[in-house]
Amino acid sequence: MGNSAKKFPPIQGGALILLTLALSLATFMQVLDSTIANVAIPTIAGDLGASFSQGTWVITSFGVANAISIPITGWLAKRFGEVRLFLVSTFLFVVSSWLCGIADSLEALIIFRVIQGAVAGPVIPLSQSLLLNNYPPEKRGMALAFWSMTIVVAPIFGPILGGWISDNIHWGWIFFINVPIGLSVVLISWKILGSRESEIVHQPIDKVGLVLLVLGVGCLQLMLDQGREQDWFNSNEIIILAVVAVVCLIALVIWELTDDNPVVDISLFHSRNFSVGCLCTSLAFLIYLGSVVLIPLLLQQVFHYTATWAGLAASPVGLFPILLSPIIGRFGYKIDMRILVTISFIVYAITFYWRAVTFEPSMTFVDVALPQLVQGLAVSCFFMPLTTITLSGLPAHKMASASSLFNFLRTLAGSVGTSLTTFMWYNREAVHHTQLTEHINPYNPISQSFYHQMNQFGLSDTQTSAYLAQQITSQGFIIGANEIFWLSAMGFLGLLIVIWFAKPPFGTQH
């Protein structure tokens, strides 16, 4: 039996700075890897002789394995120790990244991505719990702010970096960049934390719970990733996945409430702040990550931006978190955490409303970048206060389980958000396309006048119809995006009420 991490004195000085950097880099690396491959799928699929739809399994395979492994992190950490599990997971992440980079077939790449996703699961929750358990109580806010910044900034830089790599060098470097970063994280963490292992508990594994978890979460993630490709519930495959996911997840909750050694600690929801924090974080991340995917898609499909320029237009959101996170971490505890979250949700609502009324066919790069820049204020006040509220009052020995469940729900919400947003966007485009097309008929003098003008410019009626169809599609996508932005603004205003159900005091001193 090892010692509980709680018994070790806090780390101080240069070692503390190095540890913070290493754990934050581990988080950044893992979150970056979940988005960096998205824009490179056409390049990867073409290079490996596969279709685009087959290439999407490069994303799906990682997402499914990752979603399954995150919630069992708490049990694994108790069984093998938090430090040991973190070091092994990070090292295996490095190895699997290298294997992904040298893969010479799509099948091999998918297998290595499954391994990569599975070993990546424990990295984020353990980096969070190790940071909190080894920091001086008075400095935990700053540590959490710096760590949180990587969670919300990494998805922005993933498409930029992935686009640049796929455009300029071999796509394998999307994965190779993890190797030096990951090895540095392992060496620094081992040097500082090697003798600070958490308590090891030899408890039996909950086999039934594990099977239900794998089936439920795996089917749910597959459904979310493949839904649009398979036309959602018009596909028997998607219906079967949905039924299996719902049945298994309901059975999982019932089973875990009665099992003595649950693989997922449902009892954490007895904590009011944990429940409120998970709900607010999950719903907010669902909306936020949906926009992270939607805005580059809109810019590429309608405004013909390259992947790199679409990423650059979205990137200003990272400026304020980089500048303000240390300040909020240093002074945030002087005010009610709920106030910081309220400010965040209000700014989120304002920026989504801003997009809803300004996104139009003639908008410029600045029109996209400016709301992104202001939204950075919301991001700065978002993750650190919500994480603090969620974990407040929990004992140290439950921190790994709480962090893994919290991050699992956040990750799952992000998957739901991206799938739901893209589904709504394409669906609303189809609706608006039909509505707008109805106005193009022989009885509408405006449309007939337009055809006449185009004839004078030398275009035939067929060419004019093709041009109008293209314009209607673009308008449909823009209107659909604006409707989603409106709905997102309303969602954040609704969350303003929920966050005030959290109960002070807040803090990570346990």
Curated annotation (Swiss-Prot):
- GO terms for CC? plasma membrane
- UniProt function note: Confers resistance to antibiotics.
- Positions in the Cytoplasmic compartment: 1-7, 53-56, 113, 166-168, 225-237, 300-308, 360-375, 505-510
> Could you tell me the gene encoding this protein?
emrB
GO MF term set: transmembrane transporter activity
Identify this protein by name: Multidrug export protein EmrB
Periplasmic face of the membrane: 29-31, 78-91, 135-144, 190-203, 259-278, 330-338, 397-483
| Organism listed in the record | Haemophilus influenzae (strain ATCC 51907 / DSM 11121 / KW20 / Rd)
Family designation: Belongs to the major facilitator superfamily. EmrB family.
Give GO BP annotations, semicolon-separated: response to antibiotic; transmembrane transport
Q: Which UniProt keywords apply?
A: Antibiotic resistance, Cell inner membrane, Cell membrane, Membrane, Transmembrane, Transmembrane helix, Transport
Q: Where in the cell is it found?
A: Cell inner membrane
Q: Which SUPFAM superfamilies match?
A: MFS general substrate transporter (SSF103473)
* Membrane-spanning ranges: 8-28, 32-52, 57-77, 92-112, 114-134, 145-165, 169-189, 204-224, 238-258, 279-299, 309-329, 339-359, 376-396, 484-504
Keyword Cell membrane listed:
yes
Instruction: List the membrane topology term(s).
Output: Multi-pass membrane protein
